[in-house]
Structures are given as C-alpha cells and as structure tokens.
C-alpha cells in the first residue's frame, strides 16, 4: 500500500532531479515516520505503530498490512546475500556534472548533499556475492540518493556489473528503485538507457541469466531500459513500475485509472512481471532460479529403470481399443494437469508468467525446474479438476498471450541451453473474438517456426487431449510421446461429425475414422512412443502415471542431450518433413554458422530468431 498523493510537489522534482513522470514525493516513497524520541515508527501504508527493532527483523514489512518499506543498499544486500559473501566492485570515478548544470542550486551541491545525507557515493552500487551458495553479481539502487535517478555514474555502475557478469559467466541480479533519468545530466543521462540495454544484450548473446527485482518505485528511464529487459522479472508486493506516472496519464487521457494501476499485482495480470515475491520468500525464489540457470556438461538424467519398459514404440504391443473410449478417457477431469506433473516429477519448479506485452494466459503454464537434477524448461496447457478452475484456466485453451508466453520461455531455454519439455492436454487454441483480434493464428505459426529451429532438445508429451493446431504449437519436438489414454487429432470428433457427417451424434464414428488413439498414431508415425498408464488410467493413479512419465522423459533426454545443435535441428526438421510423402525427403541441414557444430552446452539464440 502507498500514501495517496494529493498534488505534484515541485520541490520534490527539483530535489531529486528526475524526469517529469508525474509522480509525487509521497507517492514515490512513503517512508516509516518516526515518533519523536521513540523507538516506534508509523507504517507508511496503514499508519499503524511499528516497533523499530521488530520491524527491522521482519525485513521492514508491516505485519498488519504487508506494506514493504524502502530499503537501503546495505539492508537489501543483507536480506538477499549469504552472510559475509558480499564483495564490493569498484567503479572508477567519472565526471558527475557533465553539463555544469545549475537550476535554483548547482547540481554539484545537490550531489554533495545527497552523499552527506545517505553515506553513498551514488544511487547504485555493485557487488559480487552468493545466494544459497549460487554466485551472482548484484546491482542495487537506493532511492534516497536523488530519487534513484539514472545518470552517467549509475549507468556506469550497472554496465560494469553486466560486464563483470559476462567475464565471469555469472548471473546478474538488478534491484531497482528509481524515479527515472536524471535531468541535471541532460542527454548524457538519456544515453544511459541505450548503454545499459546494450549491456544486457551482450549477456543474452552469451547465454547468461539476468533477473530483475522491481521495488517501489521504478519509473521512467530505468523502467524503460534495464529494469524490464531481464530474463525473469520479480516484483515486491505493491511495487509500482511504469514509464509515465499515474498523474501524467490521468491528466493526458482525462480518465480515472484503476486503483491498482501500475502496481505489481496489475502488472502480473497484464503479463509484465513473472512473479510477485514477499521479502521473506525472495532468497528462496532467487536461489531456485539461480540453481537452474544453466546445464552442466555432465547434465544427463540418470536411468532409474528400463527405458524399453517406460515407452512402447511398437504399435503391435498395444491393445486395440475403441477410439471413442479413448476420447472419453482423455477428457476425464481426474487426469493429472501440467502443474500436477510439475509438482510430482520436478525439483525447484518456478512458474514464469506473462507474454511481456499485454497479458498472462492461465490456460498455459511455463517455468524452470530440474528433472533428476537436470535443469529444464517446462511448458504445458492447464485445465483443472473443478468447474471454477476450468473456467479460470479457460478450459485449457490458450490465448495468443499463452503461446507468446511459451515462446518467451522457449527462447530463454535456448539462451541458457536448457532442454524443453511440453505437456499437452487441450481441446485446441481458444476460439474467441479477442483471440482473433490478438492474432491467434500468428501466435501459433510463430511458435511452429520457433520450435523448428530451437537449438536445444525438445520433448513433447500429449497427456490428454491433443487438439489441432493449438496442440501442435507445443508439439513440434525431437521426440513426441503420448499417454496410452490420450488422443491427438486435426479436429475434435464432434466437430468432424458435425461438418462431414452433418450429425454430431456421429462423433464415435468420426473418432474411429480420424484414428485419434495412441495405437493408430504410433502406427502412423505421428508419435514416437506411448507411455502406458496404470490400471484404471492416469486419473486412477496420478502418482503412478507421473512416475512413468518421469522415466519416459529421462530416457528421451538421455538420447537427445548428447547431440549437438546441428544434429538436433536437422533430425527434427527431417522428422516433420517426411509427413505425407511416400518416400522420405533427404534431411536438410541448417545454414552453416560459426557455432553450427557446438554441443548443447554451448549457448546460442540465433536459431530462435
């Protein structure tokens, strides 16, 4: 929560020297107010009395309203890093007043006063450290220093930190708190947006994880550069992020904005941030992300059982069954969902949300975790087990935002060199007016093109329904498997019956004609293997089904991870090239490049663009 702003305070803008984003001093940073001569503070959110020592022990979070108070650089480092692990990174001094700027006071005087009042040299600092033993380079901002504004020195601190992360191949964590670019440095301050963005681009090219922690507030030039370019964006509860401030927008468009506008909660719904993390959970969330940020050269899953028993590859070993019965079995609500499987077969799974454009689609979940110790990216459609969950999850039918979210996470997997696992249980892509307005067809097509050249292993499993292009958009893979009671088809049996038989009641006949069941699809070569289900089906024994799925995935990854990028992409393209031709066409290798023969442990994102 934040104190309500009542007017734009010119003195606050003058003091901080940030760009005019339309945020007031009270809206920018409500701080706990100290009662004179007392160890008690007043909460900046709800106004309740806070005992200072207890407030500090609880991470400067109000126990009554969960308001997250601002933190200094040192407080932030103490919260996040392992004890005694922080090692400051020196940044050479640069000219702090390139324009010799004076308004009502000389800029150099403002800098001198900010240094005296905060004990800091500038609004940002860089350190090396560890989080739960995972090495990380951290750049932290402090709003107390001229509103955390972005000037030449702050830009240099960030860029030096990014370059250090690049040299040491260490993840970069940025903690932002800023009102925007520093006006007293003019166009030099503006150029820091380009300079810092360029530095993050180099980390992308090198395959190094970047994480941004958004704290309140993060606006203007910082929001429009390094704060939002990270691979993963975490926000503290209530933290606000935006380019223009609320008041500027309201005055421009003459509309009253939602109460939660630009808050972390608003941004999560609108696809901008991956997760909201209370302070007490930050270290654990960051440690999980850092632990799965790259795959070791020896990262091959162990085979706990016999692969030939985990997956059936000969259709004659599968019993014939009625296709309509398979359709009905695939739709049973008790079948495990993607999140169920993630909880049962993965360690340290962290869900990532949002398409970074406009929305988060709850019908498609994505994230990073570890399978038998091997870091992986997992994507899957999500239905649910109750009527309320089905409605919330859009009955497992992804919108364009869902497919764009999956593409974002697949590109991240390619950058980090992580194998991709997709789990598919959907009647198809969501058919609606908004979906068409947002280019549903384009989103599906772009996923297909992306997956065709993804330079990491991809394993797809149809766990329930595999409906048309909406399913295929996650199933362009090196290895395509399906559960024994799953189905996969160009159209639903009911839809086919209505169109071709002119009678929806002919759905059982249409299902048989479409050959939607596992045995027929294995015989046709559409799938590479079938995962047997326990007696009674996956819904009768979710844990047993998950164990079989885990073993099947282990076997597939053990086969695929040793292959280099050229082999992977060539084989994947050849697999899909041969459908519909009597004689398989010769495989066409990807265009030659300098890293065409690199192993999967080498990082490359060029093939995903």
UniProtKB/Swiss-Prot annotation:
Q: Where is the composition biased (Low complexity)?
A: 582-592
User: In residue numbers, where are the C4-type zinc fingers?
Assistant: 43-65
Q: Give me the ranges of the annotated region Disordered.
A: 582-609
What EC number(s) has UniProt assigned to this enzyme? 2.1.3.15
User: Where is the segment annotated Acetyl-coenzyme A carboxylase carboxyl transferase subunit beta?
Assistant: 1-271
Which superkingdom, per the lineage? Bacteria
Task: Quote the record's binding site residues for Zn(2+).
Answer: 43, 46, 62, 65
Q: Where is the composition biased (Basic and acidic residues)?
A: 594-609
Keyword field: ATP-binding, Cytoplasm, Fatty acid biosynthesis, Fatty acid metabolism, Lipid biosynthesis, Lipid metabolism, Metal-binding, Nucleotide-binding, Transferase, Zinc, Zinc-finger
Q: Where is this region: Acetyl-coenzyme A carboxylase carboxyl transferase subunit alpha?
A: 272-582
Give the reaction(s) catalysed. Answer: N(6)-carboxybiotinyl-L-lysyl-[protein] + acetyl-CoA = N(6)-biotinyl-L-lysyl-[protein] + malonyl-CoA
Annotated region (Carboxyltransferase), positions in chain: 39-559
- Pathway where it operates: Lipid metabolism; malonyl-CoA biosynthesis; malonyl-CoA from acetyl-CoA: step 1/1
Offer one example of a GO biological process linked to this entry.
Answer: malonyl-CoA biosynthetic process
The record, for Gene3D superfamilies, names:
2-enoyl-CoA Hydratase, Chain A, domain 1 (3.90.226.10)
InterPro entries (alphabetical): Acetyl_CoA_COase_a_su, Acetyl_CoA_COase_Trfase_b_su, ClpP/crotonase-like_dom_sf, COA_CT_C, COA_CT_N
- Its Gene Ontology molecular function terms? acetyl-CoA carboxylase activity; ATP binding; carboxyl- or carbamoyltransferase activity; zinc ion binding
Q: Where in the cell is it found?
A: Cytoplasm
Q: List required co-factors.
A: Zn(2+)
Q: Where are the transmembrane segments?
A: none
- The broad enzyme category this protein falls into is transferase
Per UniProt, residues of the CoA carboxyltransferase N-terminal domain are 39-308
User: What is the annotated role of this protein in its UniProt record?
Assistant: Component of the acetyl coenzyme A carboxylase (ACC) complex. Biotin carboxylase (BC) catalyzes the carboxylation of biotin on its carrier protein (BCCP) and then the CO(2) group is transferred by the transcarboxylase to acetyl-CoA to form malonyl-CoA.
Oligomeric and partner information: Acetyl-CoA carboxylase is a heterotetramer composed of biotin carboxyl carrier protein (AccB), biotin carboxylase (AccC) and two subunits of ACCase subunit beta/alpha.
Protein family according to the UniProt entry: In the N-terminal section; belongs to the AccD/PCCB family. In the C-terminal section; belongs to the AccA family.
Name-wise, this protein is Acetyl-coenzyme A carboxylase carboxyl transferase subunits beta/alpha
Which species expresses this protein natively?
Frankia alni (strain DSM 45986 / CECT 9034 / ACN14a)
